[in-house]
Amino acid sequence: IASLIMPALIGVVSDKWVNAERLMGVLHWVGAISLFCAAFVTDYDLFKIAMLVNMLAYMPTLSLSYTVAYNAIDKAGLDRIKDYPPVRVWGTIGFIVAMWIDNLTGFSSNNGQLIMAACASAAMGLYCFTLPACPPAKAMKNNGLMSVLGLDALVLFKNYRTAVFLLFSFLLGAALQVTNMYGVPFLDSFKATHPEAWAVKYSVILSSLSQVSETLFILAIPFFMSRYGIKRVMIISFMAWVLRFGFFAIGGPEGFPVVFLVLSMIVYGMAFDFFNVSGSLFISDEAPASIKASAQGIFMMMTNGLGSIVGGYGAGLVIAYHSENGVVTDWPACWTIFAAYACVIGILFALTFHYKHQAKVKAEKV
C-alpha cells in the first residue's frame, strides 16, 4: 500500500515545493520515530500502526534517493551510468552488514532489530541534510490542469517507449514480489525433512549470497549499459529471473541440488540490479527535469506498488493450488510456473520495446 501511494505523491512534493534531500531527511526521521515506537509498544494494533507509518515514510525515500544521487552526480559533472553504480553498491553492502549483525547478535528474535533500524534511520535522516541541494525544478510556463493536480509525471505514458518500459517494470515487479514473499518460506520448508542439511543450518549465509551477488552485478552495470543499452540489459534481467526461479525448481537442501540453490542466489543479483538500478537510470534519462522526482516515484509505484500487489495475489493463487492444509506440497511446480511467467514476459518485452542503442566506446580507448 505504501509503495502504491507514497513514492509518486512525495515525488510531486519534491518536484514542486521541497528540496528532495530535505524531504528525504524528514521522512527518515519519521521512520526512526515510528520504529522506536514499534520496538516498545505491547499492543499489536499499535504495533501495526507504527509499522504502517514507517513504511509510508520509508518507501518514498527509495525513489528520492535516486533523484538526490543523480542530482549530485550531475552537479559534479560526472556520468550517471558510469558513476552511480559504485555509489549504489554501498546500499547493498549496508544491507548485508545489517543482516549479519541482526543474525549474529540475536536481534532477529527480539526488538533489537527495530531499535537498530531506528538508530540507522535517525542517522540517515541527519546525513541527508549534508547532501548537495536538490531543489524543485522551475515551474513550467504553461501550467495546465495536470500540473495543478500534480499529475505531470503521467506524461511519461504518452511516450510509447517509456509506457512499454513502465508496463514491463510492473510485470517484473510482480516477479520480484514472488521471490520476496516465497523465497524464505521455500528454504524454510527443508527444515522439516532435512534439519541437518547444509542449506538449512547455514540458511542465512545462503540467502546473503544474493546480496553479495548484487554488489558484483551493480558494479557491472556501467559496462553493460554503455555497451549494450537498456533493452539488452533488461532482456538479460528477464533471463536471470527465469534462471532464478528455474534453479529453485530443481534445487534441494543437500547433495548436488544444493548447487542450484547457490546458483539461484548468485543469479538473483543480475535479475534484480539489471532491472531495478538500470531501470531507474533509464527513467532518469527519459523524464524531463521538471518531473525528475515524480518520474522515479512512478517507476517505484509500478514496481514495488502495483507489481507487488498483483505479484502477491497471483503467486498466492499458484501457491494455494499446490498446497494442502496450508502446506505447500509441490514447490518445483510452483517455481516452474514462475519461471515460465518470467520467460513469457521477457519474450514480449523483446518484441514490443523499441530502442536503438549507440555504444559508448571512448572510455575504452584511453
What feature does the model see in each segment?
Residues 132-167, 189-194:
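Juxtamembrane intracellular "pre-TM" segments in multi-pass secondary transporters
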Residues 52-90:
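Cytoplasmic helix-loop-helix junction between adjacent transmembrane helices
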Residues 31-34, 44-64, 170-171, 258-274:
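Hydrophobic core of transmembrane alpha-helices in multi-pass small-molecule transporters
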Residues 38-41, 121-133, 305, 334-366:
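Multi-pass alpha-helical transporter architecture, strongest
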Residues 29-43, 239-254:
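C-terminal ends and interior cores of transmembrane alpha-helices
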Residues 181-203:
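Short amphipathic helix-loop junctions that connect adjacent transmembrane helices
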Residues 104-120, 317-343:
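A membrane-interface helix-boundary motif in multi-pass transporters
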Residues 1-12, 205-220:
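Central cavity-lining transmembrane alpha-helices of secondary-active solute carriers
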